[in-house]
């Protein structure tokens, strides 16, 4: 969503590099470009004016004039001001001292409230809570049924005493349903109640009155206004009107994966004064994240979001499996079965293009990322699943006739099977040598033994191999699939620009080796 803004701001930053001293003309030109970039992103006019004014004042102050690298100091100022308009610190959901915690969802029709209710319930359930969904949208046809479907997918019970709007039933009372849902939660010991309310095509008196009545009846701990980030300044106007009429404690931005300009996300916090709590980036129940202003600012400035990428990996990779895979890599015994498990885990993290987009400098290779096709991973998965357990455990036994059978069974060509097998052997060899060079215990002795055995003049047969390409991601981490083991149609990631192998400014001292995975002490 922020691609256009990110490209413009990145261009402004690059234009400052190499300048030892910034003149007033440089500052004026820089702030003018920033102003135009924000206007193009559909950011609210008052927000743009205040943002640019603060940058200009700080750029002319002593923190820039006394800096050893004034250009880098400007980047720091822009980053800090972006974090400021996005909310500053990360705001977590506030839980009641005495359960149940009541969360009320409000917003316009089509903003994604019902789907968000399921996403929030899944997140809370994984954190050990026992949520209950309450269906109070009794006006939109099939709204209650939709929430029941979402609740079933999320594995969370739904309280729906009224079927909702239909020719066979009269109008229901959402206030009574909300109150009854709270009684149900207390009786059955649910510790979180998520109330899904009705939306409108626009703010009107009826919407305000109904939302106000529900809020007064259940006294929620959190009122989250669900905002469609793709509708631009209308979203900010709507949020401001709802905040003045009913009030809310937090904002949830939906559809951040869309191609809109994203000005609403940069404006809503500054205009309403209410923090952004969550953001959604897709329709799946897992496409839901806590909103981190600092990480979002880092992504907008093209510095990536490495910490979010690490957190996603922590959620899908099991610590014991990661250690077992690392041991197999060290011993040179990684199998295609292990590779399949790793690939499936990566798929759980989301689209490959989105994951690569979290890396620093990814905005500079937009065309390359657009070529990444997740369907190629499906073809690799089909090839491996077409093998017998013995062939996955020992790919060396896959001869020509077996490769033909695998190709016919998985719907691919023999050439694709050959490429997968050959590249797997090459990647396994590379990972073993890399880990050995990192001082992994036992690797040095094992390598020396192999070398001495191979010094008797015996030549090993070798099949066709693919050209060796240095991975821009460095050595494969334990439990993570090696990015070298990609299908031939993937772009050449070795041609990516400098910066992809670096953490954003301020995170340079972050030691990935000290990261603790779940269940690991």
UniProtKB/Swiss-Prot annotation:
Entry's localization field: Cytoplasm
InterPro entries (UniProt xref): AAA+_ATPase, P-loop_NTPase, Signal_recog_part_SRP54_M_sf, Signal_recog_particl_SRP54_hlx, Signal_recog_particle_SRP54_M, SRP, SRP54, SRP54_GTPase_dom
Keywords: Cytoplasm, GTP-binding, Hydrolase, Nucleotide-binding, Ribonucleoprotein, RNA-binding, Signal recognition particle
TM stretches of this protein: none
Protein residues bound to GTP: 107-114, 196-200, 254-257
Highest rank taxon of the organism: Bacteria
Pfam families in the cross-refs: SRP54, SRP54_N, SRP_SPB
Residues in coiled coil: none
Major location category of this protein: cytoplasm
Catalytic activity: GTP + H2O = GDP + phosphate + H(+)
Annotated GO CC locations: signal recognition particle
EC number: 3.6.5.4
Keyword Glycosyltransferase on entry: no
Annotated stretches, region: Disordered: 436-505
Keyword rRNA-binding: no
Biased composition (Basic residues): 447-462
Family to which this protein belongs: Belongs to the GTP-binding SRP family. SRP54 subfamily.
Subunit structure: Part of the signal recognition particle protein translocation system, which is composed of SRP and FtsY.
Domain-level remarks: Composed of three domains: the N-terminal N domain, which is responsible for interactions with the ribosome, the central G domain, which binds GTP, and the C-terminal M domain, which binds the RNA and the signal sequence of the RNC.
Its biological purpose: Involved in targeting and insertion of nascent membrane proteins into the cytoplasmic membrane. Binds to the hydrophobic signal sequence of the ribosome-nascent chain (RNC) as it emerges from the ribosomes. The SRP-RNC complex is then targeted to the cytoplasmic membrane where it interacts with the SRP receptor FtsY.
Designated name of the protein: Signal recognition particle protein
Protein source organism: Mycobacterium leprae (strain TN)
Gene this chain is encoded by: ffh
